[in-house]
Amino acid sequence: MNARSTYPGDVAVTIPEVHPDLTALAPLLGTWSGKGSGEYPTIEPFDYTEEITFGHTGKPFLTYVQRTRAADDGRPLHAETGYLRAPTPNNVEWILAHPTGITEIQEGPLTADGDTLRMDLISTDIGRSESAKEVMAVGRSMQISGDTLTYTLRMAAVGRPLQHHLSAVLHRVSS
């Protein structure tokens, strides 16, 4: 059964049910906010704030929007948008686009243990525009325990091997 929501102006909007293929990913739904830090051999270490929103349309994918800002002065740093799919109950595909001219397809296992959900993904394809920096591989490990989301991101770029780049802890601010 679909839920109905009324917005100002008496516009009725039907909110679809989460697609059955996404049952395992449902704990991601909502908006998450928190802090992280980054490092890489070619840049100075930095701290950032982050907001991530996972949504759905009733189709067999989650929508994903991510934004980061510098912790010291709030200037925009990075953004990503994409889709998360679970073609099988124990496997995830994450399709991402970056405004820096990079696209990623990452795949990997999805495990659930009680209220803990874990994904360990590695890029199977990286697309680059002609002007984008060289990125050869990206890996993400994400864990959701209750209302806490933690992740690490590894990257191979500009001639460097796959290594730690980012880590963050976020908390659910809305479902």
Swiss-Prot record:
Task: List, separated by semicolons, the cofactors it needs.
Answer: heme b
Q: What SUPFAM superfamilies does this protein map onto? A: Lipocalins
For the ligand (heme b), the binding residues are 165
Entry EC number(s): 5.99.-.-
Entry GO MF terms: heme binding; metal ion binding; peroxynitrite isomerase activity
- Has UniProt tagged this entry with the keyword Phosphoprotein? no
The annotation note on the cofactor reads: Binds 1 heme b group per subunit, that coordinates a highly solvent-exposed Fe(III) atom.
Q: Which residues form the signal peptide?
A: none
- Domain commentary: Forms a 10-stranded antiparallel beta-barrel structure able to accommodate a hydrophobic ligand in its interior. In fact, this fold hosts the heme group, which is located in a wide surface cleft.
Report the PANTHER family cross-referenced here: PEROXYNITRITE ISOMERASE THAP4, THAP4 PROTEIN
**HAMAP family linked to this entry:** nitrobindin
Q: Which family does it belong to?
A: Belongs to the nitrobindin family.
Under what name is this protein listed?
Peroxynitrite isomerase 1
Q: Which organism is it from?
A: Mycobacterium sp. (strain JLS)
